[in-house]
């Protein structure tokens, strides 16, 4: 029989069929009862699987690509081996029961954000903090920092820093900017140094976080600018030498500085090139306002992380590691109890005048600070046979003072308490001074192993800032004023770092009576 023309025959004729056929008389459809092998791709649109049971894909060539949505799957999906790639899912995914996931690496590496909503109480164990979210000892940064020092200078220069000007230069307080301008001329050696009147105590086991804000002069040849937690012997600071940026550790222990140039920083180099050495993609410009930070894990051999806070993020630029390092056989610097310092210096002749702006600083003990039980308690007082006779003209007379030894000017000493006892009934007034200078009397070492001297008979007050003033009642009662945390650090003994002059903690008294005698005592805590 001749093969018919398909366009002329309807329905088609089937030839050479060796399998059983079935005709659906109602529809006219013919079904072949056999397994059909399909060569090529079959595109399947949306498939709704509404029945319970298993979907068997065995025997097919993998991978199986499904385009479109698969909805209405109930039951188990088992026996999947290999990788499953799931494109982003929009909407909610409801999961009932346990989800067990096994993979081959530990710990898991997760990129991006994970948002989890817990409908019931659950135990969440988080460990292994790293980077800027943790402090220097690996603890998650939480909201319990203890502020040891801060300076804002909103309305006045509060005298928290000493200045040392060499050659042509000056320091100008700018009230409407709450900042200071450090200005130098062009001659070699012109410099302005600014350092706090006291160092800030490091407590072992606590991360010490320092933040300094500034704006350096545009870098130029022979102009060096520095900011950080340091003094002439030890410390951690950021430096621009006119050509390069550096992170520096100054060591009084080794007598050298470890200077790491920007292109060798082991964190984010802030070069703007992106990639592994600059994951933030940010470029550092020291001539713009910046927030420099350092967190110190001292213990003599700990790590120091330094960097900048930019757009609200702590960016670690470099980490100095000291434990278990080749060649390290002693502490990396003498102490971490150090002052805040700013410097601008001409290392040789400079083409034009320069200005660095000092803005704000803070020193924080992360994880709190326990003053009680720390250091050595000491005291000084008048002996019973030698009270102090007050003047009859109601003028204030110094009765007792303490100060740092000239050899221990970086010691941390906190006055904790004082007591005053009049010997007769009268009206007595007293004043407590910090940052005082007196004349006369004799300074006595508190002990051979103490950093403090006391004076039981100063003659006159030369200068000082009144920190407290009040009255003693007229019934021979004692008065005491224990200094409590966190206010205790406001009374820390200070010194002028560039002249080596120790400032005094001083008590003066006055009375309306005549020939009035008093006793006085002071207690303090020597932290370092």
Please place each PLM-identified region on the residue numbering.
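Noncatalytic modules at the cell exterior or secretory-pathway interfaces
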Residues: 334-344, 416-418, 494-513
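Localized edge beta-strand/strand-to-loop motifs within extracellular or lumenal beta-rich domains
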Residues: 287-303
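Extended, low-complexity segments enriched in Ser/Thr/Gly and acidic residues that occur primarily
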Residues: 1-164, 370-426, 469
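Beta-sandwich interaction modules
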Residues: 278-286, 290, 475-502
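C-terminal interaction-tip segments
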Residues: 221-242, 313-316, 500-502, 508-528
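Short, aromatic/His-centered strand-loop micro-motif at the edge of beta-sheets
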Residues: 255-291
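Extended, solvent-exposed segments with strong compositional bias
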Residues: 451-491
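Low-complexity, Ser/Thr/Pro/Gly-rich disordered linker/stalk regions
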Residues: 121-250, 255-268, 322-394, 398-407, ...
């Amino acid at each position: 029989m001749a093969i018919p023309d398909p366009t002329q025959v309807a329905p088609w004729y089937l030839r050479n069929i060796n399998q059983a056929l079935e005709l659906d008389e109602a529809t006219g459809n013919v079904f072949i009862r056999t397994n059909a092998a399909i060569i090529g791709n079959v595109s399947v649109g949306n498939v709704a699987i509404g029945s319970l049971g298993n979907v068997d894909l065995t025997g097919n060539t993998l991978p199986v690509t499904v385009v479109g949505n698969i909805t209405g799957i109930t039951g188990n999906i088992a026996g999947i081996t290999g990788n499953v790639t799931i494109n982003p899912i929009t909407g909610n995914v409801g999961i009932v029961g346990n989800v067990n996931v096994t993979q081959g690496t530990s710990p898991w590496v997760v990129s991006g954000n994970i948002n989890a909503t817990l409908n019931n109480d659950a135990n969440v164990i988080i460990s292994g903090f790293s980077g800027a979210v943790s402090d220097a000892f690996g603890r998650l940064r939480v909201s319990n920092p203890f502020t040891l020092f801060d300076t804002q200078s909103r309305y006045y220069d509060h005298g928290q820093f000493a200045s040392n000007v060499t050659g042509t230069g000056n320091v100008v307080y700018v009230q409407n900017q709450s900042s200071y301008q450090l200005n130098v001329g062009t001659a070699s050696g012109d410099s302005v140094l600014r350092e706090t009147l006291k160092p800030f105590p490091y407590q072992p086991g606590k991360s010490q976080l320092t933040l300094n804000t500034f704006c350096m002069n545009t870098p130029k040849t022979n102009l060096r600018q520095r900011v950080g937690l340091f003094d002439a012997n030890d410390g951690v600071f950021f430096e621009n030498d006119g050509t390069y940026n550096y992170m520096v550790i100054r060591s009084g222990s080794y007598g050298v500085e470890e200077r790491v140039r920007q292109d060798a920083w082991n964190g984010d180099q802030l070069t703007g090139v992106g990639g592994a050495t600059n994951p933030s993609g940010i470029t550092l410009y020291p001539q713009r306002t910046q927030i420099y930070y350092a967190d110190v894990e001292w213990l003599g051999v700990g790590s120091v992380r330094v960097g900048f806070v930019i757009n609200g993020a702590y960016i670690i630029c470099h980490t100095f590691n000291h434990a278990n390092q080749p060649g390290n056989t002693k502490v990396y610097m003498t102490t971490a109890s150090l002052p805040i310092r700013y410097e601008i210096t001409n290392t040789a002749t400079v083409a034009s005048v320069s200005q660095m702006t000092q803005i704000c600083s803070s020193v924080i003990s992360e994880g709190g600070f326990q003053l009680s039980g720390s250091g050595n308690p000491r005291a000084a007082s008048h002996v019973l046979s030698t009270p102090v006779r007050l003047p009859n003209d109601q003028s204030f007379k110094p009765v007792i003072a303490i100060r740092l030894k000239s050899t221990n000017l970086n010691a941390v000493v906190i006055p904790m308490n004082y007591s005053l006892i009049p010997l007769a009934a009268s009206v007595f007034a007293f004043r407590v001074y910090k940052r005082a200078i007196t004349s006369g009397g004799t300074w006595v070492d508190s002990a051979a192993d103490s950093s403090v001297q006391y004076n039981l008979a100063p003659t006159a007050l030369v200068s000082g800032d009144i920190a407290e003033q009040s009255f003693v009642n007229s019934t021979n009662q004692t008065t005491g004023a224990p200094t409590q945390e966190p206010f205790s650090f406001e009374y820390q003994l200070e010194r002028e770092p560039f002249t080596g002059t120790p400032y005094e903690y001083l008590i003066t008294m006055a009375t309306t009576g005549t020939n009035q005698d008093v006793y006085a005592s002071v207690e303090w805590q020597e932290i370092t």
